[in-house]
Amino acid sequence: MTPAPHAGVEAALLALPTGVFRGQTGNRRYVVSKTLFNAGKSIKLVAEELGGDDYISLNFYRLNRGARLYPCEMSAKKVTDFVMTLKPEPAQDDA
């Protein structure tokens, strides 16, 4: 059985924290916002590079007929590579 084309991306997205967090991929750091809609069947992820101009935006839909990845004005490879390599940073207390 062949895995679903977006199975790795789906698992990586689900593993990321919901809400706003900081993360790193390669030598770049990002502020990331992950929002769930429709009881988690739709995921919106937006990331802005800290101190740079890189930007990531995508929508991911978990449909009955299969998962669908919709990058926003960028390649599917760019958003897939980003999601698969993004490592959230530990949360810092504001105390």
Predicted regions mapped to residue ranges:
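Negatively charged, low-complexity tracts enriched in Asp/Glu with abundant Ser/Thr
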Residues: 1-33
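Residues that cap or delimit alpha-helices
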Residues: 17, 75-76, 87
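Acidic, aromatic-enriched beta-alpha/helix-loop junctions
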Residues: 36-80
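Long, highly charged low-complexity segments enriched in Glu/Asp and Lys/Arg with interspersed Ser/Thr
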Residues: 83-90
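Polar/charged low-complexity regulatory segments
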Residues: 92-95
